[in-house]
């Protein structure tokens, strides 16, 4: 088993882990991200991306923000939650959502230079992971956290 030293160990390469890794690497902080699987998200998961998350992507660079928008459903196409008896049944009600109702559009427009959108995790996760690795994050797939011990010199983590 190899001994590897890093300033920060990030466990998980989902959106939070990969964004953390990308931001740390952007600031020159050595880090390693591990993922117990050998792949990134490949099944339906989270998909609504709020304005604050888009601001974090903008902090990573306009190229990252622009790539996210390229894969996302724009906010103005996310406007309704529809309630039906079934997929082909009678519509029971409709509610404007995701900041598209007339009374909330202005609030969203003035609160941030970014826009809420529908960006599935299957697109977001690879974008963040690619950004992190391209900026210096060391990544290890098929590595699972087992334990850690903290002492005066730091933290020793065992992965398998």
Question: Which positions does each model-derived feature cover?
Answer:
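Active-site-adjacent segment of FAD-dependent monooxygenases/related oxidoreductases
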Residues: 42-133
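A conserved short coil-to-beta-strand element within the FAD-binding core of flavoproteins
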Residues: 141-158
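Residue-level detector of anion-binding/catalytic polar loops
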Residues: 30, 63, 138
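Phosphate-binding active sites in nucleotide-utilizing proteins
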Residues: 14, 40, 133, 147-152
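N-terminal Rossmann-like FAD-binding beta1-loop-alpha1 element of flavoenzymes
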Residues: 3-33
């Amino acid at each position: 088993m190899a001994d590897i030293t890093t300033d920060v160990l990030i466990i998980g390469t989902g959106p939070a882990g990969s964004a953390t890794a990308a931001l740390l690497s952007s600031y020159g902080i050595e880090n390693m991200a591990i993922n117990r699987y050998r792949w990134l998200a490949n099944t339906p998961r989270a998909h609504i991306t709020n304005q604050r998350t888009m601001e974090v992507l903008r902090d990573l660079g306009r190229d990252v923000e622009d790539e996210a928008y390229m894969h996302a459903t724009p906010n103005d196409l996310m406007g309704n939650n529809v309630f039906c008896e079934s997929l082909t049944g009678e519509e029971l009600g409709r509610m404007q959502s995701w900041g598209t109702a007339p009374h909330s559009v202005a609030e969203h427009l003035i609160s941030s230079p970014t826009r809420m959108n529908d960006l599935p995790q299957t697109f977001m996760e690879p974008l963040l992971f690619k950004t992190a690795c391209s900026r210096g994050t060391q990544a290890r797939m098929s590595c699972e956290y087992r334990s850690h011990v903290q002492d005066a010199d730091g933290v020793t983590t065992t992965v398998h």
